[in-house]
Structures are given as structure tokens and as C-alpha cells.
């Protein structure tokens, strides 16, 4: 195959030289020269890296010696029985306790027994009580009694006693005019004392009095 390619290339090269020359040019016969060139790329050198060396180390498991803990458990129990006088009834108590460093447990048990106890179911008694009737009572209010205390009438009225005596100015007994002197005698006017007069009046309780 490559020979055909070389031949075709040589023929094309020869024809190119003949066609490109001018028509007036004369060529002398040249010796036939055949050249063949083959260019091949250098082979690619593929270098594979050395395989990775994987070393698996053995797993070393070290078991430690068990650690001993000295933690004793403490337990206690208690039991008591109490009986009645005849021995028919008994009450028993039982308790137990266990304590350790990691836990604590308690248990209690109480039982009551009575050999002479007869269980009888009491009959169901239903009672119904009617409510007391409602009694309506009405109390009349006491009448309002209005009392008015009037002032007692005045039993006696004392008026001012009139003046028992009245003294008037005595008239002028003589009159002197420009006249001849005449001997005159004046006489004094005397009044007797008036009697004492008292008046009183009363009006009230349907009666009127005056004196």
C-alpha cells in the first residue's frame, strides 16, 4: 500500500514540474530520480508506574485483663406475724432489701387473714327522701305610726301691768301779762292714786278665758 502511495506522489511531482514550466522552455532529459520518504512518528513509550505496594498490617487486639471490683451486696429481710386473741385473725408483714454498688431493690408484702370472718353481701337499700314542701309565708309590715308632739299651750299669759299712776304736767296756774300787778294765789292740783288693774287671757283646748 505504501508503495502505491509513493508512486502516486512521484507521478504527481513529475506532472507538477511539467505543467508549471512555460511552453517555450526546453528541457533536457534528466535521469529518472525516484525518492521515497516515509515519516513515522516515534512510538509512544507508555511507562506504567510500579504497582502500589499495599501492606496490610495485622490488627493487633489487646484484651486487657478484667478489672475486678470488690462490691459486696448487702441483703436484709424482716418478717412479723400479729395474731388476735383467739387466733382467728392474723396480720403478717414481710420485707426484703438488697443493696449493691449498682442497684437497690425493696420488696414489701402485707397479708391479712381471718378464718372466722364470714363475708355476707349487704342488700342494697335505696332510700328516697322527698324534699320538704316549699311553704311561702308573707309577713305584713307593721303600719307606720306617726306621732307628733306639739308644744303644750301656754297656760297663763302675764301681760305687763299698766302704769298705776299717771302724772300729767300741771297746767300753768297763773298767766302774767303786762298788766298791773295783781296779787294772786295759786292752788296745787292733787290727784289720788288709781287702782291697780290686771288683765289675763287664755285660749286653748277649745276654751277661751279672759279677765
From Swiss-Prot:
Repeat region (Sequence), residues: 29-32, 41-44, 128-137, 131-134, 138-147, 141-144, 148-156, 157-165, 166-174, 175-183
Induction: By juvenile hormone.
Signal sequence region: 1-16
Region (4 X 9 AA tandem repeat of Y-A-A-H-A-P-V-[VA]-[AT]): 148-183
InterPro entries: Cuticle_C1
Tissue specificity note: Restricted to sternal, tergal, legs and wing anlagen epidermis, and soft cuticle secreting epidermis, such as intersegmental membranes and pleura. No expression in muscles or fat body.
The UniProt record lists the keyword Repeat: yes
Annotated segments matching region 2 X 10 AA tandem repeat of Y-A-H-A-A-P-V-V-S-[ST]: 128-147
Swiss-Prot/TrEMBL keywords: Cuticle, Repeat, Signal
Gene Ontology molecular functions: structural constituent of cuticle
Protein's job: Component of the hard and soft cuticles of the larva and pupa of Tenebrio molitor.
Domain notes: The tetrapeptide (A-A-P-[AV]) repeats found throughout the protein are also present in many proteins constituting the protective envelope of other species.
Name of the protein in its database record: Larval/pupal cuticle protein H1C
Organism: Tenebrio molitor
Originating gene: LPCP-22
Amino acid at each position: 500500500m505504501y508503495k502505491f502511495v509513493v508512486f502516486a506522489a512521484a507521478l504527481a511531482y513529475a506532472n507538477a514540474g511539467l505543467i508549471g514550466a512555460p511552453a517555450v522552455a526546453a528541457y533536457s532529459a534528466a535521469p529518472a530520480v525516484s525518492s521515497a520518504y516515509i515519516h513515522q512518528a516515534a512510538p509512544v513509550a507508555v511507562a506504567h508506574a510500579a504497582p502500589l505496594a499495599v501492606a496490610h498490617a495485622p490488627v493487633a487486639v489487646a484484651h486487657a485483663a478484667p478489672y475486678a471490683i470488690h462490691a459486696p451486696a448487702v441483703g436484709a429481710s424482716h418478717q412479723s406475724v400479729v395474731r388476735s386473741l383467739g387466733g382467728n385473725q392474723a396480720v403478717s408483714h414481710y420485707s426484703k432489701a438488697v443493696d449493691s454498688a449498682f442497684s437497690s431493690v425493696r420488696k414489701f408484702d402485707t397479708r391479712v387473714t381471718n378464718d372466722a370472718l364470714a363475708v355476707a353481701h349487704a342488700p342494697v337499700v335505696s332510700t328516697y327522701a322527698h324534699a320538704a314542701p316549699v311553704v311561702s309565708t308573707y309577713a305584713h309590715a307593721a303600719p307606720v305610726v306617726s306621732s307628733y308632739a306639739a308644744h303644750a299651750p301656754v297656760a297663763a299669759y302675764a301681760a305687763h301691768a299698766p302704769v298705776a299712776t299717771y302724772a300729767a304736767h300741771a297746767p300753768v296756774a297763773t298767766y302774767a301779762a303786762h298788766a298791773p300787778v295783781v296779787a294772786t294765789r295759786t292752788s296745787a292740783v292733787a290727784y289720788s292714786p288709781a287702782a291697780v288693774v290686771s288683765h289675763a287671757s287664755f285660749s286653748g283646748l277649745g276654751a277661751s278665758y279672759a279677765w
